[in-house]
Amino acid sequence: ASSMRLIFGGNPGETMFTTSDIGWVVGHSYIIYGPLINGMATIMYEGTPLRPDAGIWWSLVEKYKVSVMFSAPTAVRVLKKQDPAFLSKYNLSTLRTLFLAGEPLDEPTASWIHGALKKPVVDNYWQTETGWPILAIQRGVEVMPHKFGSPGVPVYGYNMKLLDESTGAELGPDQKGVVAIEGPLPPGCMQTVWGDDQRFVKTYWETVPGKMVYSTFDWAIKDKD
């Protein structure tokens, strides 16, 4: 619930449009639970961003006065190939921010949709296992610029480490390593594997030599800033 205010900037009485499938964690967290707990209306949309035409999402933003939108880079890349008139024909004045997650957001895609919408485009990184963002820009906590090509900084509640997967050594800027989280995990994250606590520990917490840390199994490079 706190992420709705501190990360996504949603307010009670507003509308959120998350284009995810309800069978995926983003659908659970940000079509159902997050917006409704925060007193927002939510749009549940079934279909592609191209049917009946490439303006369908933007028509919903206009019709329901969407303030916060959450989608995926792949969907934006699909829309980038379409006639730009489908985007410009709708009134998107209520939309404050477009959030994107689910895969790496490349700079050309981010720059294109930012220029087309003339709205902030904010990346964020997380997993099914965490249920909410791990890395993000948290304007409800601290005002900071976002940088295309980066999902942001560690979210409150996460003690993030970038580690050498072979030695467990902590890495510095411009070094590639595995993204890890020191325990305890914050509320919202998985607590075990159903009926098999040992599998949970062995799979997620015992993969980095000499460290009892949660491994995301994802790789990253930390910027100097």
Regions found by a protein language model. Give the residues of each.
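Conserved AMP-binding/adenylation subdomain of ANL enzymes
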Residues: A1-T15, V25-S67, K81-Q82
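Active-site phosphate/pyrophosphate- and oxyanion-stabilizing loops and adjacent acidic/basic residues
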Residues: S2, S111, G149
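Gly/Ser/Thr-rich phosphate-binding loop
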Residues: N11-M16, Y33, I37-M40, S67-S71, ...
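Active-site glycine-centered loops adjacent to acidic/histidine catalytic or metal-binding residues
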Residues: D21, G102, W126, G152, ...
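Alpha-helix/helix-capping structural signal
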Residues: T74-R77, E103-P104, P184-G188
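Short Gly/Pro-enriched turn/cap motifs at secondary-structure boundaries
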Residues: K147-P154, E170, T203-M212
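Conserved ATP-binding/catalytic segment of the ANL
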Residues: D174, A180-D225
